[in-house]
Amino acid sequence: MTSATIPAHAELILPAPAKLNLMLHILGRRADGYHQLQTLFQFLDHGDELGFSVRQDGEIRLHTPIDGVPHASNLIVRAAKRLQEASGTTLGADIWLDKRLPMGGGIGGGSSDAATTLLGLDHLWHTRLGEDRLAEIGLALGADVPVFVRGRAAFAEGVGELLTPVELEEPWFLVAVPQVFVSTAEVFGAPELTRDTPPIKVRSLLAGGGRNDCQPVVEKRYPEVRNALILLNKFVSARLTGTGACIFGSFPNRDDADKVARQLPGTLPSFVAQGRNISMLHRRLQALAKK
């Protein structure tokens, strides 16, 4: 099925699902400036969509550029070129993006697009580098890319690259989207950011522990996020995902989530999606492999 953005002649159409950071602890800062963290990722059955077709001339053409993002620095283009370099292929690609996820939202839009590009073109180009190598390429593009390449809910450590698969409940989430772009660099550079949270064991986390250490910083610096949290907390325990700006609450069923969504003002866009331990992208690739 194609969207208005992706033409019917695209050879391969794949989802690029959103993710939530159900918690995020900052343990410290490394000498290179990166932060040691612990976080829990789960995917959503909602996201962007990408279409791909093979080119014989080696060119990478993204036909749906994003306003304000130069072609050469777009993560989709960078992922495609990194895969070309790593595999030695002479093939290129036409790529179309149906952008549904907000930028600067903390739900992984750009990282997910990059991972879908790596996996999609690895399939179309028959480069077959394997998940480990693709995750390695992805890490050079961004700390969140490997979790999308792996496609499994995970407890992440290090800078986010050390992944332990976990089995979580798959509740329904209401994700609200405050209309502000949150700078990840600003949040992680904030003097007031907690950077000394003690490490937590994954079993303790799954028993209900954890918080988001970035949330107090974002609430202080971005009143749009603070006000959205105050509003959503009237209905459900709400939390920031990643560095935001998106916030979320969980529900046992879709009806309950939809009821709250209908009570939010039009100035606070939102969507309802179910948590997934296996990403939509991997479900689609598994289905293709069976054909």
Swiss-Prot record:
Ligand binding (ATP): 102-112
Domain of life: Bacteria
Protein name: 4-diphosphocytidyl-2-C-methyl-D-erythritol kinase
InterPro entries: GHMP_kinase_C_dom, GHMP_kinase_C_sf, GHMP_kinase_N_dom, IspE, Ribosomal_Su5_D2-typ_SF, Ribsml_uS5_D2-typ_fold_subgr
Family, similarity comment: Belongs to the GHMP kinase family. IspE subfamily.
Swiss-Prot/TrEMBL keywords: ATP-binding, Isoprene biosynthesis, Kinase, Nucleotide-binding, Transferase
Species of provenance: Ectopseudomonas mendocina (strain ymp) (Pseudomonas mendocina)
Keyword Kinase: yes
Keyword ATP-binding tagged: yes
Pathway: Isoprenoid biosynthesis; isopentenyl diphosphate biosynthesis via DXP pathway; isopentenyl diphosphate from 1-deoxy-D-xylulose 5-phosphate: step 3/6
Active-site residues, as the UniProt record annotates them: 19, 144
NCBIfam families to which the protein is assigned, alphabetical: ispE
UniProt function note: Catalyzes the phosphorylation of the position 2 hydroxy group of 4-diphosphocytidyl-2C-methyl-D-erythritol.
Enzyme class: transferase
Reaction equation(s) it catalyzes: 4-CDP-2-C-methyl-D-erythritol + ATP = 4-CDP-2-C-methyl-D-erythritol 2-phosphate + ADP + H(+)
One GO BP: terpenoid biosynthetic process
Gene Ontology MF terms: 4-(cytidine 5'-diphospho)-2-C-methyl-D-erythritol kinase activity; ATP binding
Enzyme Commission identifier(s): 2.7.1.148
